[in-house]
Amino acid sequence: MRSIALMLALSSCVTPSSSDTPHDDPYHSTALKWHQGSIEDAFKQAKKERKLVFLYWGAKWCPPCNELKAQVFSQPRFAELMTSSVPVYLDGDSEYAQIWGELLQVSGYPTILLLTDEKKELMRISESLTYDEFAATYLDAVSGDHTGFSERLEAGISGKATPQQWRLLAYGSWYGTRNLDLHSDLMLEKRMKLIANVPTRLKVEKAILSAELLKSAAEISRDSAIVRKLRTQAVKYLDSFLDSDETIFAARTTIIYSMKPILNWAFGKNQQTIKEQSRKRWLAAAEKIRGKPELSVDTRLWGWYPEIETYEMDLPKSKASLPELQVKVRDATIAADSSATSDFERQAVISGAAHLLGRVELYDEAAELLLREAKKSVYPYYYYSSLSQLEKKRGDTNKSLVYSKKASQSATGKSTKIQWLVQDINMLISTPAADKAQQISGLLEQVYNQIFAQKDGFSGRSYRSLKRLSKMLSSYPLDSTTSKKLKGYSLRCSRLEKRAQVRCSDHFSEILK
């Protein structure tokens, strides 16, 4: 986490107003009154009332955010839980939101922070948790010794962490803050020492930490001494979270989404027997996750993803088993569609259901599901984007472009609009299309009109969208008319505040070089 002094200095560059925080989202708990003033006002209130600041960073359209609302915010007990905090909802499309995102070092939706009135971070959660998991972690952060992440990490490595600190180390997110290089040899070694010190009775905490360590290791391509050592101990770490129903439940995110790269990383050609044994354990664990009624509809549906992953691992010899897998996935998506009754559940479930259908080549059913949902959703652009990708996958270029355009034109919210416009440009660049140059020119005009109309257009997620755009356009031959337009926009950089001015100039320099 950046120093408090730096955060306060940067925050003084903007003058947050009451519009910093949007009004109540109708999908949030009706029992809880979210803070309606500026972010700074929330910290002032927390100091005055001797409370903490509970800050939720999200977007109304994002599926994981809606799962969080279904699992946690909508629960009757949530409002009571928040009595020790000032609850703040920072929507990524609200005024100054992306500047605040950088100050607080949050980017991915959703992220939950628990902060002192001096902005010291006590908790960060980005994973999907049940209400009970969330409540226990939150209460540990509130009632504990108020140590930060680095202090907890060192306490764990030295074997002096308290039970509350162990829980926060396990359930708290390690990503997106504190400038940690989770893939460095030093950090891998620290994490191995940390896991070795977890008390025997804390099986759940050890399971989560072990699963996250293997996930990080599987993302590494180098072959250092510590990586080789970790690979030789992979089975031990797998045992930590595949050993029981309790540990499987705790490490479900890794089990669902990350086991394929873990197994490929851990086991070479001479270890096929143990790899196959581990794969069977993986599939058995996924089956248990699917049968957990405490989990959200979305998580139980994604419990079928390992079945798809193992099918794809065995291609082409597994092709004969596709019809059987299609039946399983179809039945699962129908059940999820039926079970997801609230708006936030549907926003969390439907795009994932369509993705799983597409992965087993049930393209028509996936398209039908997405089209049906787009017609009744207040966020149709999310489904149109999925439709665009689906049609591109099955080779219908025209439909792919039509849905991509529908997505970008129906998108709302300042940062969201930029993100979807850039996606549409990317689709045009990567796909054969008539009058491509003219369409791209028109979309670029929309992007820059949006960017320069915003006070945080060169910050946070909006700036990340611009960096993706720079990369696309740096290798794309712009026509003279479009180049002239971009040079005109680049002249507006000098009107921005200093940091945005530098980023703006760098952006156009990359494109127009």
Predicted feature residues:
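Thioredoxin-like thiol-disulfide oxidoreductase module
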Residues: I39-K47, A70-E127, E133-A141
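Residue at a conserved register position within TPR or TPR-like alpha-solenoid repeats
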Residues: A266, Y311, L357, E391, ...
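Long, ordered, amphipathic alpha-helical scaffolds
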Residues: N426-K513
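Conserved redox-active cysteine motifs that mediate thiol-disulfide chemistry
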Residues: W57-Q71
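Alpha-helical repeat scaffolds
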Residues: E151-L153, L182-P199, R222-D245, Q271-P293, ...
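Charged, amphipathic alpha-helical linkers/stalks
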Residues: T130-L188
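Structural motif corresponding to the intra-repeat A-B loop/turn of tetratricopeptide repeats
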Residues: V360, R394, T431-A434
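Generic helix N-cap/helix-start motif at coil->alpha-helix transitions
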Residues: A161-R167, R201-E212, E246-I262, P293-E312, ...
